[in-house]
């Protein structure tokens, strides 16, 4: 083997860790199976068009024959979107439709995602003023999805 070829092979082997590191930079992170990545501060809420910035209140719905995705900055926007658009997207009422909300207690860049219909909700100031944040388990002052939904629908907007 010539000296030039050895250098070429050695350089290629030396670049392998760098290539692995760079490929990790484009990874999807800890998104649940089937959830489309939310691009923070760039993606907008399908209902109010506000940028999705506060990770503690974000949500996403995915389903239907085309696996359509809707992203939300506030669970209240999601509730009202379903009310307003159910005729256009009847699959949103299907229990098979996936619906995620961020855990209110998520910190930093790490977001824990919850099934919106199984989560519990605390009263907490939220981006659009519907004032509910999701937590995983019942605790004093929480309500289930149906009760939170009723409050949002009563408030309207």
Please identify what each model-predicted range represents.
Residues 29-88:
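N-terminal secretory signal peptides
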Residues 15, 84-85, 155:
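Alpha-helix boundary/capping residues
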Residues 97-157:
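Beta-strand-rich cores of mature extracytoplasmic or soluble domains
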Residues 1-16:
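N-terminal secretory signal peptides and thylakoid transit peptides that target proteins
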Residues 23-24:
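C-terminal motif of bacterial Sec signal peptides marking the signal peptidase cleavage site
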Residues 69-113:
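Mature extracytoplasmic domains of secretory-pathway proteins
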